[in-house]
């Protein structure tokens, strides 16, 4: 795509080397749509940097990523729960749930393992059908 754009003199936004497509949300390619939709790009980037700082902590209960990974390991490997559901109760958060599903599937689904299957659901829509099945 980039070579086509260069050949036809179409401007493009840079994606830093080593940044996979699913993480480009934090690059100019991902930040431009946020800005065009009126989102607060600076607040978004500050939030990402803040989470990165938290995820560098070495104390388990101060590191949300390590804590989530630990909980998921226990639920999956020790308890046998093979599905990881992200179910926001806001329609506005539906795309975040789907993005999380993509991140988990693409990051952990590359090799045959016992990783949980990620699933996105919407609270009020799915709680009366899927949630009943999961809780049975």
Where are these regions (language model features)?
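Active-site phosphate/pyrophosphate-binding segments
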Residues: 1-136
């Amino acid at each position: 795509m980039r070579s086509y754009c260069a050949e036809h003199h179409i401007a493009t936004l840079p994606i830093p080397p080593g940044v996979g497509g699913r993480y480009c949300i934090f690059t100019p390619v991902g930040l431009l749509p946020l800005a065009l939709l009126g989102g607060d790009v600076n607040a978004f980037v500050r939030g990402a940097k803040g989470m990165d700082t938290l995820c560098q902590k070495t104390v388990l209960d101060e590191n949300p990523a390590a804590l989530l990974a630990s909980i998921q390991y226990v639920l999956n490997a020790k308890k046998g729960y093979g599905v990881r559901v992200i179910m926001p109760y806001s329609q506005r958060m539906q795309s975040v749930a789907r993005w999380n599903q993509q991140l988990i599937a693409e990051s952990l689904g590359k090799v045959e393992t016992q990783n949980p299957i990620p699933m996105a659901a919407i609270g009020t829509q799915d709680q009366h059908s899927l949630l009943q099945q999961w809780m049975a």
